[in-house]
């Protein structure tokens, strides 16, 4: 700011310069005019304080013509200075507050992170424990499921055996009833037998209802879900990683914590279960038949697998996987053979080999692909054809020589398809006007024949008296049931099941006819080879006269089946003794046997009840 004194000095100098420019008097003139005399001097005065505080606004147009005074300039400067000072103070206070809050937040964040780190460690341990427990539980459930499937398969085999035994019982009763009906002699009068076919029918219906029950686990629990845990590469997405690197140290501690991700994998109908899939969880491995590791059940070794007997089940390692080997005891009819599993997978079964292929025993059950829903093939064993030979083991065996039992199939889509179907034919046996249907079995080898005993006996008696007269008497005896054929039984075609052949029967029988008569004929008449070929001996009784010196000649012809035996006896009364029970004690007798082989013909009854012969 210029003072008034300086302003006046400047004005005076300017005026002097203008005066000199306007006239050019000589320098001496200035002095002559009084220029050399000192004039009055400017006196400096003190400026008074600015009393005016409100100054009008000075626009840009007025700036050249009007210049603001010093008081106005000072007031404006002070006003701006106060405004800036207040702003700076506010910013400083805010900065102090923010610094304090930042320190507090950092301390609090550090405490929270420490707490979270402990919680995260506990949660991770809990997750690992949960995974182990879930895997253990899943393995136990798998063991139970496999045991259930194994037991269901055993139940199915037992149900099939029960059904076969029921059919055999019904067939046996019908066979017994047919034999009793065909016997019109003493056996028909002594024994009354009735077959309750309706009861068998009801039992078969109940058994079919029981077999139709699906015992396998449901489809929902066949494929158990699997829990998988994996480590997460980073707790935050990639776009935020750079920001996390610039974050405070307290936040960077989160990167040191290991984060895991838990996924529950479910399997559908096309998926694989944990014990059967290629991708498996921790510590879960399927077993193998040779080396049952984590999935072997053990060996089931029953003793004598017969009625009322039970086997011994020796479990292996109780871990999920395949079943062991089930070995029965005696391979008797109706018993099961060795069950060797194939691949240890759900619903699969191995090869079921029977013992002896006797009636009632099962054949080989070879499954297809041991996957859920696969079907196996049940091949029956070879059963002996019916035989009518004297040394055969059954009389008119009504079991077909090559029965068509159908297929034993196990199918299902996870219910292990275990719907077992067993198709059979039917056996039709006619007796009179009654038709008997046995289950669904079909005779493929022809009609069922039943052998009946019948005989025709011709007795010729020749008596020569002392005076030379000869009396000849012929007597013909015919019997349809063999009851009037005498004490001898020439039933060559009848055999005894489960009793052996006729040789065993002769040894077991205690009848005097088979003991004394056969020995006497072998020793005295020399007909042992003939009787050995026939397999049995036969004779007829003869009568003797009470007159003395009488010559008795007796001839007997017996026609049985396809052979005939003729016996002739020549005796003197004085040499003959009492003949009892066909034993020729001390007698000089000669017996001739003539046999003529004929093809055996079976006798069966027509629907009208009349017997007929079939070649």
UniProtKB/Swiss-Prot annotation:
Glycans are attached at residue 325. Its main location: secreted. Pfam families: Fib_alpha (PF08702), Fibrinogen_aC (PF12160). Residues 373-396, 537-549 have a biased composition (Low complexity). Disulfide bonds join 455-485. The record marks 38-39 as: Cleavage. Keywords: Adaptive immunity, Blood coagulation, Coiled coil, Disulfide bond, Glycoprotein, Hemostasis, Immunity, Innate immunity, Secreted, Signal. It is found in: Secreted. GO terms for biological process: adaptive immune response; blood coagulation, common pathway; fibrinolysis; innate immune response; platelet aggregation; positive regulation of heterotypic cell-cell adhesion; protein polymerization. Residues 293-302, 550-560 have a biased composition (Polar residues). GO terms for cellular component: fibrinogen complex. Conversion of fibrinogen to fibrin is triggered by thrombin, which cleaves fibrinopeptides A and B from alpha and beta chains, and thus exposes the N-terminal polymerization sites responsible for the formation of the soft clot. The soft clot is converted into the hard clot by factor XIIIA which catalyzes the epsilon-(gamma-glutamyl)lysine cross-linking between gamma chains (stronger) and between alpha chains (weaker) of different monomers. This is Fibrinogen alpha chain. The lineage of its organism: Eukaryota, Metazoa, Chordata, Craniata, Vertebrata.
